[in-house]
Amino acid sequence: VSDWNQFKGDAHHSGTRLDREGPRRIERSWTADFVGPVGEPVCDHETVFVGTAQGNLYAIDATTGSRRWVVETTAATDRAPIVSREMVHFGTDAGKLYAVDRTSGDRYWTLTLPGPLTASPTQFEDRLYVGYEGGLAVCVAETGEVIWSYDTDGSVVGCPAVTDDREWSGPRVYAGTDEEAVFCLEAGDGEEVWRVPTDGVLAGGPTVAEGRVYVADDAGTLLSLDTDTGQSWFTYKTDGGFSSSVTVRSGENLAVDEVTTAEEVTEGTTFIGANDGYVHVTDTTFGRRKVRGWLFSKKGVALDGEIHASPVVVGNVVCLADTTGSVYGIDATRYDHWWYEQLEDAVTNTPAVGQRRLFVPCEDDRLYCLEWDPDEQPGL
């Protein structure tokens, strides 16, 4: 089973690993140095794959941080790559999409897109979904053959999300544009199913969970939309703007225990970073605030800086990072702090989750590995 093979771990962009015990105590295991701010990592079978704002794709040993191979490029590669059984796919700001051997870095194919990539690509089954300036393209992962493309008025914003439903004729893809809209396409032929305007430009791509699409924008609006029709289930608004994609701790994957209530299992929780220094926390039923104060509910959990990196959830722990370089572990139901780690510069790209490891990219040109031992965790 893959650890975290693409942006936020899967084609839905869930950003969660609820089947694992979360880190209630962490230690810094290693750091790896690069040239340029580090992009969004992915990891699979003890190897981390990551690019930088200066270019190149690197394969790093997940245990030691040592370099296994590097593919040189002349353009930025800071979007999350995709790793599969045999290949690694990654794109550049120059509009190139590459497929290389996951073991050696040897190149299989190169695809030139009509414009620079604007987000991480997504893989669903044997196809890649790639957003760029002016549209979205779908190609065969093994060969790079383009199946169809969809023109947009502006640039695709954030990583496209793909999901399937047994009542549909095939999968569907969800994406946003900088023209302040989110849309749904048939994954088979690119036919538009629905389009919904947003109040601002999406902050990161859509997230799909339990039949809903969640999008947050830089105008401070969170929308929960029906995956089939685009109908709005709820709207949550805040002053300022959101600055990360939505992470959903889905209730359908939880069990009632000493820290997870029956209400949590029924409704689930959203976590969204904002430029007001809060991770906003709502339920998935009505979009109500879930963090309680002495007299009134609070908008979320306060951090030291803006939150551009999307939250990731491991078990019952939400892992967060902000623009001051602070990294936190927060209880996902009580919202108390479990741990805190201070890095040397801002964290603006989303971390990756491995086996008992969190890989955090930093703007100080380093990748940090934070590690935990499930047998040496503090009690609940």
Task: Enumerate the predicted regions with their spans.
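Extracytoplasmic/lumenal domain signature
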Residues: V1, N5-D78, I82-T118, T122-L380
